[in-house]
């Protein structure tokens, strides 16, 4: 497994990502949910390095293997809360924003 982005070569981009992470860490979103979102975004992006890293973070916070294994199909799985579903929909929409825009209903659900 190889790291896709060399943080030292792309320090300007990484600083922006870290700043965003720092900002979000101060929000009302709890760490286990952040970890779940990071893992889902890594699935979408196809980053094996990130999936390995975030799966370890999830397991360390008590995430179950069952939820990890079906996260790719979270819409059909009964294991996620309403809050998690709203956050997952938002994360997917933002990650795939080049395919259109974040739908209003996704934005409204995540605001709640």
What function would you assign to each model-found segment?
Residues 1-36, 55-59:
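Acidic, glycine/proline-rich low-complexity segments that act as flexible tails and inter-domain linkers
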Residues 31-35, 49, 66:
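Short, solvent-exposed positions on alpha-helices
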Residues 14, 51-70:
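Iron-sulfur (Fe-S) cluster-binding segments and ferredoxin-like electron-carrier domains
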Residues 70-111:
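Mid-chain, well-packed structural core segment of small domains
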Residues 37, 41-54:
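Short, thiol/selenol-centered motifs that function as redox-active sites or metal-ligating centers
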């Amino acid at each position: 497994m190889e790291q896709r982005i060399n943080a030292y070569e792309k320090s300007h981009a990484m600083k922006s990502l870290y700043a965003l992470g720092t900002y979000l860490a101060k929000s009302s979103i709890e760490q286990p949910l952040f970890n779940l979102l990071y893992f889902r975004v890594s699935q979408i992006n196809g980053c094996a390095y990130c999936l390995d890293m975030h799966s370890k973070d999830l397991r360390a916070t008590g995430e179950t293997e069952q939820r990890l294994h079906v996260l790719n199909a979270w819409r059909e799985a009964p294991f996620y809360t309403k809050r998690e579903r709203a956050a997952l929909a938002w994360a997917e929409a933002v990650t795939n924003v080049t395919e259109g825009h974040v739908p209003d209903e996704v934005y409204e659900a995540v605001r709640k």
